[in-house]
Swiss-Prot record:
Compartments where located: Secreted
GO cellular component, as recorded: extracellular region
Identification of the protein by name: Locustatachykinin-3
Originating species: Locusta migratoria (Migratory locust)
Secreted listed as a keyword: yes
Gene Ontology biological process terms in this record: neuropeptide signaling pathway
Described function: Myoactive peptide. Stimulates the contraction of the oviduct and foregut.
Keyword Secreted attributed: yes
Taxonomic superkingdom: Eukaryota
Key words, A-Z: Amidation, Neuropeptide, Secreted
Record PTM Arginine amide, positions in chain: 10
Length: 10
């Protein structure tokens, strides 16, 4: 699961 991706997109 892309944790950094979630926050990165947000």
């Amino acid at each position: 699961a892309p944790q950094a991706g979630f926050y990165g997109v947000r």
